Design a protein with these regions (language model features):
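Basic, Lys/Arg-enriched alpha-helical interface segments
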Residues: 1-67, 102, 110
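Enriched for short, Lys/Arg-rich terminal
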Residues: 70-110
């Protein structure tokens, strides 16, 4: 069953911040390609969200959170942190894979 996707405002801000980083450190074309790839990969989460591993921070949250490695290249260098509510995949944050761990104060409750 294909679930709908909703990005929390923080996830949208993360994507914009990373897009601007790509544009500043690579090129506008590279940044737009990164955005296209990431949006496609986020959409693919909805096909089988339970196939993604629990986030390392999962135990700190009152609801289940999972990670999808995303981005250009064979191994995504970003992670989409998400949860599933009813029939919706809620993307909480989109972070660089090397960024620190999240706590409940870093995300908006879905």
């Amino acid at each position: 069953m294909l679930l709908s996707i909703r990005l929390q405002p923080e996830a949208e801000e993360d994507i914009l911040r990373n897009l601007l980083w790509w544009a500043g450190h690579h090129s506008t074309d590279e940044a737009l390609e990164w955005q296209r790839v990431v949006q496609k990969q986020i959409t693919q989460i909805s096909l089988n969200p339970d196939s993604y591993p629990l986030s390392i921070e999962n135990d700190a949250f009152p609801y289940e959170i999972r990670d999808a490695l995303i981005g250009k290249g064979k191994r995504g260098s970003y992670r989409a942190v998400f949860t599933v509510t009813d029939d919706t995949v809620v993307v909480l944050r989109v972070l660089g894979a090397s960024q620190g761990q999240l706590g409940p104060v870093d995300v908006r409750h879905p």
